[in-house]
């Protein structure tokens, strides 16, 4: 038997497996080409795309909206309940309580107000003595940061006083402590000046003693009480 050449093509029939229209690959060096899409398959794909069109998408959208509605209502329920509670509390509030709350708000507004600056003898701004308290502290000036954030200062103050009623008393306590501290410093300074006129050599030791006592009274003792260490210290 003679051998066939390597590039000879042998036609094969696809009658056994039903592939009559699919061209067969060559035996030699050829590649099998993909079969073109049949008209029946193209028609089935178009029908499937038509079935999966806007109707299922609309149905899914309605189902998603129905699922999201109870969750949104559950999230908004606490906010609405809090608003109703505040409105009911405002309705039950007596005129005396309303007047007291307005007085507290006015007092806190006065304490938190910005000081009017003056020019000192050295050309530096100096706060007036009438604007004492927390208003002299620059990091508590809230008006400019709140205005940048778009928050009304009076609304913020009212919300703070309604939710934290202990704040006015705490601010007044800090103001009173600051006033006593300033008065003690001024009295001690006057005493030092008088003592220096009589005995200049002893003033340095008195200054050191006063500094240590002031640090202990204003810093160390409150820190010890805050940490709860005063229970372990023998006061005797």
Swiss-Prot record:
The keyword Nucleus applies. GO terms for molecular function: SMAD binding; transcription corepressor activity. Residues 170-190 form a coiled coil. GO terms for biological process: cell differentiation; muscle organ development; negative regulation of DNA-templated transcription; negative regulation of SMAD protein signal transduction; negative regulation of transcription by RNA polymerase II; negative regulation of transforming growth factor beta receptor signaling pathway; regulation of cell population proliferation; transforming growth factor beta receptor complex assembly. Residues 18-34 have a biased composition (Basic and acidic residues). Transmembrane segments: none annotated. Residues 38-71 have a biased composition (Low complexity). Keywords: Coiled coil, Developmental protein, Differentiation, Methylation, Myogenesis, Nucleus, Repressor, Transcription, Transcription regulation. The modification Omega-N-methylarginine is found at residues 59, 75. The keyword Repressor applies. Residues 1-71, 112-131 are annotated as: Disordered. Heterodimer with EID2B. Interacts with the C-terminus of EP300. Interacts with HDAC1 and HDAC2. Interacts with SMAD2, SMAD4 and with the MH2 domain of SMAD3. Interacts with EP300 and acts as a repressor of MYOD-dependent transcription and muscle differentiation. Inhibits EP300 histone acetyltransferase activity. Acts as a repressor of TGFB/SMAD transcriptional responses. May act as a repressor of the TGFB/SMAD3-dependent signaling by selectively blocking formation of TGFB-induced SMAD3-SMAD4 complex. The N-terminal portion of EID2 is required for nuclear localization. This is EP300-interacting inhibitor of differentiation 2. It comes from Homo sapiens (Human). The gene is EID2.
